[in-house]
Amino acid sequence: MNTQPTRAIETSGLVKVYNGTRAVDGLDLNVPAGLVYGILGPNGAGKSTTIRMLATLLRPDGGTARVFGHDVTSEPDTVRRRISVTGQYASVDEGLTGTENLVMMGRLQGYSWARARERAAELIDGFGLGDARDRLLKTYSGGMRRRLDIAASIVVTPDLLFLDEPTTGLDPRSRNQVWDIVRALVDAGTTVLLTTQYLDEADQLADRIAVIDHGRVIAEGTTGELKSSLGSNVLRLRLHDAQSRAEAERLLSAELGVTIHRDSDPTALSARIDDPRQGMRALAELSRTHLEVRSFSLGQSSLDEVFLALTGHPADDRSTEEAAEEEKVA
C-alpha cells in the first residue's frame, strides 16, 4: 500500500456538460483518506458522472480533480494505478467459474499464474465463496455475483475504491454481507467512495456524507452533523386509520406552526419542533378531537428526513425524467 496524503480526493469547480445541460455543475469535494465517504443524491444528480470523471473514464469540461494529489486529466495513468471501480452491474464473465474470473483479473494485472491462483483462492475464501469456487458464474445468486465483482476489483488492493451503488437489487442478507466486506477493506487501509440511494446504507457505512443535487454539493458532514442540522426534535406519529390523516395534519399544523410531513405510510405524519412540550400539547389536542393516535415518538431527525428537507423529495422518489437523465450520463 502506498503512503497516502491526507486527502484521497480533492475537486474544485468540477463540471461536466451533456447536450448543453450541466450534469455536474461546479462540484467541490474534499475526501479524507482512510474512510468511507458517501455521496447521496436523487437520480440525475450527477453521482455516477462524478465517479466516472474521478476514475478517469470521462474528461471534465471544467474545474479540477485530484486523486491522492494527482490530476485526473494530466496524470490519468498514475491515478489509475491507485484506484479501482465497481459499478451497479457485474463486470465479471458469466462463462467462467468464480476462481477463473479472479485468476483472469490477476493475470491482467501482471501476476504470474501461480500468484494469480493464490490471490484468487485468498479472495474466494475471504468473501465466503469457497463452496462455489468451481461453479460457473451464471449459477451464482445476485449477492454472490456482487461479492465476486468486488473481489475482482481488489485483486490488486487499491488505495481508493469507487463503489457506485454496489447493493442495488440485493436482498437484505446480501447487502449486509457487502457492508461487512466494505468495512474490512477500510480497516485494511483502502479509502472507499460510496454512492447509494439507500439512506440506511449510508448511515451504516459512511464516515462522512456529501448530499448532491443538480450536480452540486448542497450539504456535507457526518451523519450526526447532518441530522442535527434540522434541529434535535422530530415528532413522529401514526394514526389509527389513514382516513383521519388530513384532519390530523390540519390540527398539527395549526398547533405547532410548522410544516407537517407525510410519510409513505398513509397513517404516518412527522414534524420538526424546537420544544418537546410543543409535541405533547399537539398530541393532547388530537386526543381532545377524538383522533386516535396508534403510536408516537420524539427523537432526532433521520437521514431520510434530512434528504427530504435538502432535496425536496424522498430518496426513493424516481421521476421518469430523473431516471432517464441518470441512464444517459451513467
Swiss-Prot record:
Compartments where found: Cell membrane
KW Signal (keyword) present: no
Membrane topology: Peripheral membrane protein
Major enzyme class: translocase
Record has Nucleotide-binding as a keyword: yes
Record InterPro entries: AAA+_ATPase, ABC_transporter-like_ATP-bd, ABC_transporter-like_CS, ABC_transporter_ATP-binding, DrrA, DrrA1-3-like_C, P-loop_NTPase
Binding site for ATP: 41-48
Pfam families documented for this protein: ABC_tran, DrrA1-3_C
GO terms for biological process, alphabetical: daunorubicin transport; doxorubicin transport; response to antibiotic
Domain of life assignment: Bacteria
Record's keyword terms, sorted: Antibiotic resistance, ATP-binding, Cell membrane, Membrane, Nucleotide-binding, Translocase, Transport
GO molecular function: ABC-type xenobiotic transporter activity; ATP binding; ATP hydrolysis activity; GTP binding
EC number: 7.6.2.2
SUPFAM superfamilies noted in UniProt: P-loop containing nucleoside triphosphate hydrolases
ABC transporter domain sequence ranges: 9-239
GO CC, any one term: cytoplasmic side of plasma membrane
Disulfide-linked positions: none
NCBIfam families, alphabetized: drrA
Family that this chain belongs to: Belongs to the ABC transporter superfamily. Drug exporter-1 (DrugE1) (TC 3.A.1.105) family.
Quaternary assembly: The complex is composed of two ATP-binding proteins (DrrA) and two transmembrane proteins (DrrB).
Function field: Part of the ABC transporter complex DrrAB involved in daunorubicin and doxorubicin resistance. Responsible for energy coupling to the transport system. Binds ATP or GTP.
The name this protein goes by in its record: Daunorubicin/doxorubicin resistance ATP-binding protein DrrA
